[in-house]
C-alpha cells in the first residue's frame, strides 16, 4: 500500500498515474482535487490550489515521505479550499451527487438579511 492522504476534497498519493492506474512512486506525488465534484471550479481557483500544493510540498522537502507528512499537506489544502469557498472563489455544485455541504451551508443573501451577518 502506498503512502497517501485523503480528506473530503483533497487526495494526495505517493504515486504516478499510468494507464489510468496509480503506480507507487517514491519521488512523485499525485493530487486529486474535489473527486466528488462537490464544488464549481474555474481554472483560476484550481491553479491556486495547485500553487498552494507546490508551496506546501516545497516547504516539506527533505522530510520523510510518510502518511503523517502527507496528511499535514492534505489538511492544509483542505483549509485552503474552505477559504476559497468562504471568499466566494468557488461555490457548491448543486448538481453534484453529493449535497452534504461539508464546509458549511451555502450563504444566500435576501433583502431582509443582506449585510446583517457581516463580521
Swiss-Prot record:
It holds the Pfam family NdhM. It is a peripheral membrane protein. One of its GO terms (cellular component) is plasma membrane-derived thylakoid membrane. GO terms for molecular function: oxidoreductase activity, acting on NAD(P)H, quinone or similar compound as acceptor; quinone binding. Its EC number is 7.1.1.-. Keywords: Membrane, NAD, NADP, Plastoquinone, Quinone, Thylakoid, Translocase, Transport. Its main location: membrane. It is found in: Cellular thylakoid membrane. NDH-1 shuttles electrons from an unknown electron donor, via FMN and iron-sulfur (Fe-S) centers, to quinones in the respiratory and/or the photosynthetic chain. The immediate electron acceptor for the enzyme in this species is believed to be plastoquinone. Couples the redox reaction to proton translocation, and thus conserves the redox energy in a proton gradient. Cyanobacterial NDH-1 also plays a role in inorganic carbon-concentration. Belongs to the complex I NdhM subunit family. This is NAD(P)H-quinone oxidoreductase subunit M. It comes from Crocosphaera subtropica (strain ATCC 51142 / BH68). The gene is ndhM.
